[in-house]
UniProtKB/Swiss-Prot annotation:
Coiled coil: none annotated. InterPro entries: aa-tRNA-synth_II/BPL/LPL (IPR045864), Ala-tRNA-lgiase_IIc (IPR002318), Ala-tRNA-ligase_IIc_anticod-bd (IPR018162), Ala-tRNA-synth_IIc_core (IPR018165), Ala-tRNA-synth_IIc_N (IPR018164), Ala-tRNA_ligase (IPR050058), Ala_tRNA_ligase_euk/bac (IPR023033), DHHA1_dom (IPR003156). One of its GO terms (molecular function) is alanine-tRNA ligase activity. The keyword Aminoacyl-tRNA synthetase applies. It catalyses: tRNA(Ala) + L-alanine + ATP = L-alanyl-tRNA(Ala) + AMP + diphosphate. Its cofactor is Zn(2+). Signal peptide: none annotated. It is an enzyme of class 6 (ligase). The lineage of its organism: Bacteria, Pseudomonadati, Spirochaetota, Spirochaetia, Leptospirales. Belongs to the class-II aminoacyl-tRNA synthetase family. Its EC number is 6.1.1.7. This is Alanine--tRNA ligase.
Amino acid sequence: MKPKSVSEIREIFLNYFKDKSHNVVPSSSLLPAGDPTLLFTTAGMVQFKPLFTGAVELPYTRATSCQKCLRTTDLEVVGKTERHCTFFEMLGNFSFGNYFKEEAIEYALDCSVNHFGFDKNKIWVTVYTDDDEAEKIWLSKGIPKERITRLGKKDNFWGPAGDSGACGPCSELYLDRGIEKGGPNCATSGTCKPGCDCDRFLEFWNIVFNQFNQDTEGNLHPLKQTGIDTGSGLERVALLLQEVDSVYDTNELRKIISFYEELSGISYEDKTLSEISEKKNNNQQISSQVRNETKSIQDSRKTAFRVVTDHIRSVLFSIGDGIYPDRTGRGYVIRRLIRRATLFGRKLNFKEPFLYKLVDKVIEIYKARYPELQRNAAAITKTILVEEELFLKTLELGLEKIESLVQKTKAGGKTIFSGADAFLLYGTYGFPAEMTEEIVAEQGLDFDKKGFQEELEKDRQFSRESWKVNKVSLMTGLNVDKTEFLGYSSVSGKGNITHLFYNSPKSSNSLSQVDSKLQSSTPAGTGSYDSKQVSSLKEGQAGAIVLNKTPFYPEGGGQVGDIGFLRQGKNVFKVFDTQKENDSIIHFGEVLSGEFIVSQELEAEVEITRRERLKFHHSGTHLLNGALRTLLGDHVLQKGSIVSPEYLRFDFSHPSSLTSEEIRQIESWVNESIRKNFPVETKELSIEDAKKTGAVATFGEKYGERVRVVQMGDASIEFCGGTHVSRTGEIGYFFIKKESSPGAGNRRIEGVCGPAVIETFQNRFSELTESVQNLNLKIKSELGEEGTKILILSFIPGPDEIREKLEKEGASAVSFFRDLSENIATKIEENTSSFLKIKKNLAERDFENNTSVIENVLASSVDTGIGKIVSAIFEDKDPNSLKGLSDNLKVREKNLLVILGSRNSENASIVITCSSELTLKGIHCGNLIKTACELLGGKGGGRPDMAQGGGKEKQNLESAIAGVINEAKQILTGERV
């Protein structure tokens, strides 16, 4: 069999099905669009789920793709087996109501034998237990009955991907790799065939006959149209065609391993055994024990090479698709992969960050097929480096933790390291189970694999549940027709009441979701409530009204719900919030006057000013998203947003904080788009047509068959159901108030648009004015003439000047006011520092020259007959102040030894000086200071006539000074004190 490269195999497959009239569809992101039930894209069919179920109009009936996939279900064995990877490419061909079993089997066999070059006589197949039809087709294609195996649901019923979707029985192709690949009993038992746990038969092609749609409850329903979903692992096919032992020996993965060999200086094909041989006497045999130990080292290093090779691909492709390391969800999986690779890297002598160093080389292998990697290379490299550095800071803590857990286990007289402790290390410190097992084995402990697996399964279940759509109904049993939304073109309109709900004081029933909503959105009353459907609502009652038509926008897409009034004559209902449940728009509020009954026609009036501000901020959010993707790169993905009347908040994926210059560029880009006054155009399109426009979708959102697309010239095009301005010029201006981080791998921008920009600058300059006035007042009152030079005399605009300049100059005034406010704020900070410094200098000068202080210190003098010794302790005085006071004391008194100390909140300092006469009598201040500093737990030194020092043991300051006095007395008098 002629070996073929991975890229050649990929092209052979895609071209084969292209020639069979299949649409070649690019790989979708690893972040599953519109399917929150999946952490990652795990199969080629994920992007086609709506086509299989008939949820959308078919753009084609045949497709083929090579899909990026990520699965971590077998993470613990990755690197140890020949075929397991977390990241892999899945070749696939798909039929949506077009061909079925006959053609799918024909294509699989033809491509495998006549295009890949597999020996037909070595191909075995499996079919589902009762799938006689599939077996009959295989027989007709020349596969003998003895090479056809029937397997049950566990092996031959596939799907769905996620909690719901298309699924059905499947048929798999295996290649017989020879009896030598079998297990110890395979050669003699005669039962070895597909389904055996050995490595003899390797599955390389799976044909799923999609006949059912599984709902979220696990029930199967016949599909309106049958389909074909094929999966063929590219790495596995390469393993077989290149006739190597594992997927890690295929050309692309082996190349990545070679990068790590070069970086580590260790060979993947470990030479440890031969090295030991050379060290031995030529005639001396290597013992069995040495061989076993050496083999263990070889296997350990080989596993480490495979783990880092697999994980760098997974991490690199994930970050390239906007999945950043995080504390929860899919981001946590990526973080765990980085940490696992870092740990295994220690077996290859990597003690410092190393994964990031090879990002560019790995991208070089894949960039032709996946250009997004090259575009996001800088972000990928930086993110991985940051994560490695972060983990290395906690790694030593983890190793200390495992040591303490081992000691705790032994102290309790146990010989088994518990699964719960192992999972603690796994989840908190990122320690893989196998590494924990190795470490505890070195300490003579067994490892509780079962207990660990139980804890792991609990965690997996929690992870799965946390990603399911867990939507609690606002109105239990609410089943009404769709509310027609009028709000795109109007802020008022008429609608008839279809449902009324009243929240009465809570009975013994549990509090429903609507009660929580009503309590949070109405000011009336306190305590708990129960909600019930009623035929009328009366004055003073809080509740909810559902209309058949309304201009009120329900909270969604980050935009908060509208408020306003529902009226009919003297009947008035104040709306505090608007929400959506299924297709019904619900108005929450309180009856201010009159009575409301079902079927009544109401006049609905949205609060106009608030809606306008929402439009400014929602359109501004789209422009901000466009700016970020244009200036920072396509790796930027929306992670969350809030659109309120007061401000906008936008969370996005990005590995590092933004520089001041980047913030200015983003702000200028948005303001330039506002100035260009682009028309804001909206279209309702099929999901497929919408994707063709290049519109940006919010990953994780689930879209219906038809979506609304909002375009703003060439600045932005997004899927969006919110309310917007007609032209970007209406926004007026945009200003970034704050940039921060909501979590690892993500950044957050808070900004304002339109009138909110005016108000923001008015408030900001008002605060600056107050700060300047307060500082100037302090400077004048506390420094007098000394402070004249640091008075702030900057021009600060008033509210009217700010409004006039912004309204006259528009977006260009934003930069002016940003720079001015930052300059004034900097000036305040600098001059406050100068004020405190001058104030301190004046205080020190006053202290040094204070007659009362000098007199008090001199009054405490000790006369030795040869000279006097004075000492004192102060609070919060620096050494310079103490030196200044010492000099003034020596002016007042001859033959004087001065010992002064000071304490602050952290440490103590001490200064020793003496008159020149005393140095002739044997006093050496530099020696005396060492006596003091020993007690203070610090250091010091100096000349015979002056020395200084200090230490952290401030409580010993009195003892330190007393020790110096005693030593000085002994020197001067010759008497031991």
